[in-house]
């Protein structure tokens, strides 16, 4: 008499690249020793090629300290950083009519939008008034879109010349593309700028709560952060900085030297934002922000810097240990498929959640 059954065993997964062998052995049936040990074991090989890709969102805001409505932009920055500390980057371009002081202007940051102030864009996909609720919703929506490229960068001062910065950016695409049209771009931002007062439409709570500005006067002392100091290819990207043909997980390195403008007040407060422009869509595919350090120090935001969950395939479906967000599965050519009954092959898994978003490549054998 022959009896068969199916059951699942949850495995912790494998870490590291290479071949891994998992062996399962049946030791008892209904609490009794297995009388026939000729078929009580099975072995499966797992090929670990997992690469994590951290998606970061770039918010470009166009504003000015004399704009009475800008407190909502400041509040948006603060709340987005609090909600998404590892996945949110802000750049504030001061260009409010004719009221922007020369010391806050950044003519080389030549990307701009038309509209009323303040206004902003997230990844050049969503454009909106930066009321915090709008900003949080659009940042979350951009994170859920994920990315096809990981990005990291390192920035150091040129030895004996604090007015120049060496920058090296590294991109890793998760999918091969022979007709890619991507370009690197860079910006320098400065935090901690003082000596300005913010016109405040929220003074006394007349327009509701706005990040504490309701408790300040109609002209409030502020510290300006994320201020755009200079841009390098920010509008169209740097031509030929990324080849037309890209291979999956093959690092693409681009190095350049950035000249700092005279408006920079404190070199200890500057950061470099590197981002990748998708020329086909006119959007920003990914971004990273790093502090500028002295030569020999390290300030790098790694492609794999954000911890990502272990991935496993259980019962033909992808599961992620400890991750409570949404898992989406794609074939290697980018087609989304149902997360069930996965056969042998190579897949790309995208996880999107409130606190984390990631992309991993897996091989099911």
Where does each model-flagged region fall?
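Short, conserved sequence motifs used for protein processing/export or organelle targeting and
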Residues: 29-36, 86-296
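Intrinsically disordered, low-complexity Pro/Gly/Ser/Thr-rich segments with frequent PxxP/GP/PP motifs
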Residues: 1-16
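Residue-level detector of functionally pivotal "anchor" positions at catalytic/ligand-binding pockets or at interdomain
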Residues: 49-57, 291-325
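Short beta-strand elements
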Residues: 36-53, 283-297, 362-364
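Local sequence-structure signature of Cys/Sec-based thiol-disulfide redox active-site neighborhoods
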Residues: 51-88
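Short glycine/proline/serine/threonine-rich loop/turn segments at secondary-structure transition edges
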Residues: 13-23, 262-270
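Terminal processing/anchoring signals of secreted or surface-associated proteins
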Residues: 67, 120, 297-304, 316, ...
């Amino acid at each position: 008499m022959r009896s068969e059954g199916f059951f699942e065993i949850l495995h912790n997964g494998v870490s590291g690249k290479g071949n891994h062998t998992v062996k399962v052995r049946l030791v008892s049936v209904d609490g009794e020793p297995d009388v026939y040990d000729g078929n009580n074991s099975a072995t499966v090989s797992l090929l670990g090629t997992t690469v994590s890709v951290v998606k970061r969102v770039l918010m470009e805001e166009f504003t000015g300290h004399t704009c009475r409505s800008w407190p909502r932009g400041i509040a948006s920055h603060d709340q987005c950083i609090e909600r998404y500390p590892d996945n949110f980057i802000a750049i504030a371009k001061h260009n409010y009519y004719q009221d922007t002081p020369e010391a806050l202007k950044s003519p080389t940051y030549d990307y701009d939008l038309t509209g009323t102030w303040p206004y902003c864009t997230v990844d050049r996909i969503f454009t909106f008034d930066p009321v915090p609720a709008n900003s949080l919703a659009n940042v979350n929506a951009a994170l859920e879109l994920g990315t096809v490229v990981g990005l990291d960068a390192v920035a150091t001062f040129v030895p004996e010349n604090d007015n120049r910065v060496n920058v090296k950016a590294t991109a890793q695409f998760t999918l091969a593309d022979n007709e890619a049209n991507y370009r690197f771009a860079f910006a320098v931002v400065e935090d901690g700028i003082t000596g300005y007062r913010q016109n405040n439409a929220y003074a006394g709570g007349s327009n509701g709560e706005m990040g504490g500005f309701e408790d300040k006067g109609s002209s409030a002392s502020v510290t300006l952060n994320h201020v755009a100091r200079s841009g390098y290819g920010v509008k169209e990207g740097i031509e030929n900085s990324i080849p037309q043909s890209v291979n999956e997980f093959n690092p693409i390195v681009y190095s350049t030297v950035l000249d700092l403008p005279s408006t920079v007040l404190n070199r200890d407060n500057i950061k470099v934002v590197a981002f990748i422009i998708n020329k086909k869509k006119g959007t920003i595919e990914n971004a990273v922000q790093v502090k500028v350090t002295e030569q020999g120090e390290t300030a790098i935001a790694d492609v794999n810097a954000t911890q990502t969950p272990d991935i496993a395939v259980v019962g033909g479906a992808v599961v992620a240990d400890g991750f409570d967000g949404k898992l989406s599965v794609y074939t290697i050519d980018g087609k989304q498929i149902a997360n069930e009954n996965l056969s042998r092959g190579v897949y790309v898994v995208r996880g999107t959640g409130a606190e984390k978003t990631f992309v991993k490549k897996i091989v099911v054998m």
